[in-house]
């Protein structure tokens, strides 16, 4: 292994002064990043003779920044990324394997992270990243304006399926004719399904609650047809906002401005508070699909790019961020008195200081985007034990029989691109109720076939079968 050559050389390189450069998402000013880097470095310099330099880039241009950096020789040691974006970067050597460094430099993370989560970031026998310790499962449901829902007089606590929403939506339309009962989120509406998309592109397991490992085209299932018929019917009845699939507005803003009553959403502990924070309305969420976990749900991963001069030092710092609450809080929440203040120190609850808001802070707090939100302070409005609830949510989720399988689409790139274009043409419009599924889905399936969907499905089935065989 890399550090096994001689512990002496590892030791001497480990005493040299080194700066670990970190790229993370979210809005932050250069000045604030510099102050935070300085505060974080105090911890790592004393321990490892290592400084930290944090750069943050807003979500709109983050992926572009990652691609530019990976393609350049500019030094970078640690970066956040959605796992689905990196298979090609891994196969082209732009991201480094870290297997050889974990025992000596990342042993705390190694033991704290579950075997099935490590599998999700393992390619060709090598571990390539560290999965973020956030919710790693999802349920699906419907989030709605509580005041309006209560005013209908309908007992919504008994609603357990998407179909059962209809009487409530009808009543809202009748009582609030100027409000859209359902709004989309930037032109899309989530499906209320528990399929496993096996890492994206076409080809899924129809339901994680079954043992079947047959890879199918989800768009060809009765389940998809029936859900699309329901949505089309609702759109015809005026229960879904018109132009839902072409809207560029965020669902929570539409609910906040009073234009919308409800939206489909992922569910997890604290989802109500999250939507309340963004919409300014009291929210209630109905659970329609019970929580489940797949490889795709282990979706935020920290990587060591090829342009790190000392990957072992990057892994060492990552291990410290994952396990040291003092360091994690500086990087996640910023500086006390500037970016946050305690409202309940005993329970580790924080809020913005006077005059600071979510929109004017110099350092946005995004706990889930960092390696381990579970050791950070909790923002006011959330349950103080939100992180314990999240662990419980993860532990109780239905586990897909393919969790840990990592899809590599390298050999079917042309088909993947062609199918993605077809899916973009029909998917959102069907899912928002804008197209008649009985006439549209057959066309959709024909075009997917012509684009090479069967080739992708066969390749995915082959890889999945190999993986299942190797992981018996």
Question: What is the predicted function of each stretch?
Answer:
Residues 87-91, 173-181, 190-195, 262-263, ...:
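Secretory-pathway/luminal and periplasmic proteins that interact with or process carbohydrate-rich
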Residues 25, 189-208, 235-361:
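Extracytoplasmic/periplasmic substrate-binding proteins
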Residues 16-20, 48-52, 73-77, 123-128, ...:
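Loop/turn elements at helix/coil->beta-strand transitions in domains of secreted/extracellular proteins
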Residues 122-190, 206-246, 306-313, 320, ...:
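Helix-loop-helix "hinge/cap" segment bordering the ligand-binding cleft or interdomain interface
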Residues 313-434:
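Conserved small-residue motifs centered on glycine
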